[in-house]
């Protein structure tokens, strides 16, 4: 590959990055030598049985990647086309999925425009569903599997970013006071309390493989048939 022209590499990169789920197409490649099994298959068979894991996703991961200036409007036909291509679903299934997510967001008092719907479906396809599948496979062998969903919303772009990709990082690492961070992560007592609860959870997990602490209470592990998930947002709640 080092002998290929840069333009040709970039052309291939652009083709792969415009993957079906809109989030890029790069991933592990099973070659039978360096990577004998696909990661999810290996975890499902117990390759990580000795490793406790604390993992999670943000509610609106895709909104950060889709936050382009002057984002083009998305009408109903374009929404159906994008979702159908993303999920490889027929028209009836596509319509049901779109309605399901639109209704769910509205029920939770979240914006439910066509852009919001395609964003949440991209988030599910690219982040949350793969994460949940990993947790399902790992929890078969490792009882200390802990899952979270981050729902704190960014004030940036008049709130259009929602709980986007990377927004959890300043809370986990305690950098809310970094220059200009308040524009992205917010500020105030609620933000500080959330950061404290998340940092204490990560510290507790690092110390004894259990993220429970007085600020959030008992954090029960994730199980395939009891999908315990800690919600980190305006309040911390195990669901």
Question: What spans do the regions from the language model cover?
Answer:
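Short coil/turn segments at secondary-structure boundaries
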Residues: 13-15, 24-28, 95-101, 110-115, ...
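C-terminal, loop-rich substrate-recognition/catalytic regions characterized by aromatic stacking residues
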Residues: 48-104, 154, 170-173, 189, ...
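Substrate-access "cap/lid" subdomains that shape
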Residues: 1-84, 115-140
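Mobile gating loops/cap/lid regions near enzyme active sites that modulate substrate access
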Residues: 10, 14, 120, 128-239
């Amino acid at each position: 590959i080092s002998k290929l022209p840069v333009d040709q590499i970039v052309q291939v990169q652009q083709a792969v990055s415009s993957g079906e789920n809109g989030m890029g197409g790069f991933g592990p490649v099973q070659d039978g030598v360096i990577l004998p099994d696909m990661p999810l298959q290996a975890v499902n068979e117990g390759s990580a049985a000795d490793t406790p894991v604390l993992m999670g996703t943000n509610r609106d991961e895709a909104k950060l990647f889709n936050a382009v200036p002057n984002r083009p409007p998305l009408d109903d036909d374009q929404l159906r086309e994008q979702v159908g291509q993303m999920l490889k679903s027929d028209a009836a299934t596509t319509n049901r999925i779109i309605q399901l997510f639109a209704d769910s967001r509205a029920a939770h008092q979240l914006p439910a425009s066509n852009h919001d719907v395609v964003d949440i479906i991209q988030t599910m396809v690219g982040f949350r569903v793969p994460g949940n599948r990993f947790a399902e496979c790992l929890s078969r062998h490792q009882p200390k599997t802990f899952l979270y969903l981050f729902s704190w919303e960014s004030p940036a772009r008049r709130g259009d970013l929602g709980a986007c990709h990377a927004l959890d990082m300043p809370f986990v690492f305690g950098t809310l006071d970094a220059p200009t961070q308040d524009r992205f992560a917010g500020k105030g007592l609620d933000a500080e309390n959330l950061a404290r609860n998340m940092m204490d959870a990560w510290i507790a997990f690092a110390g004894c493989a259990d993220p429970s602490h007085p600020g959030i209470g008992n954090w029960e592990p994730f199980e395939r048939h009891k999908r315990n998930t800690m919600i980190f947002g305006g309040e911390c709640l195990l669901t």
